[in-house]
């Protein structure tokens, strides 16, 4: 199955006094790199490079245009998502997999994770990655 993964967006509404923008950007890049590596290593999938620039989820083209571009590049599924830091301890990761032809959401899932350090982000990435990769073949077979 050909899959494309757009960079996730990150939002911090925790109102913490310290500006953590740089560290969050670094952790999000590491999260995305690990997710792409996981998809690449999984023989069930062929990773199609994203046509979206790194800041695409926030300032890029509309989702329908991103789906069209992913489809034209050969992807059957486009994975999108974001992470929202809600408080000092709690973050929410959202993911969705969308069929690029029908533009139908194949699955959508919300994950919460605790902590805002490298270890917490790595744990979250492993869990999100496993869930996404396990759900993709299952959801495609139900179409």
Per-segment meaning from a language model:
Residues 76-117, 123-125:
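Amphipathic beta-strand/beta-sheet edge segments enriched in Tyr/Trp
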């Amino acid at each position: 199955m050909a899959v494309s993964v757009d960079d996730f967006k990150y939002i911090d509404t925790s109102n913490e006094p310290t500006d953590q923008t740089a560290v969050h950007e670094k952790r999000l890049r590491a999260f995305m790199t690990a997710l792409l590596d996981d998809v690449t290593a999984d023989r069930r999938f062929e990773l199609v490079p994203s046509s979206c620039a790194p800041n695409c989820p926030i300032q890029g083209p509309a989702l329908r245009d991103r789906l069209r571009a992913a489809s034209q590049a050969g992807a059957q599924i486009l994975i999108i998502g974001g992470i929202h830091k809600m408080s000092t301890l709690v973050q929410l990761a959202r993911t969705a997999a969308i069929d690029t032809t029908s533009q139908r959401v194949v699955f959508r899932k919300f994950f919460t994770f605790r902590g805002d350090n490298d270890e917490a982000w790595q744990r979250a990435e492993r869990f999100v990655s496993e869930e996404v990769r396990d759900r993709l073949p299952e959801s495609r077979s139900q179409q």
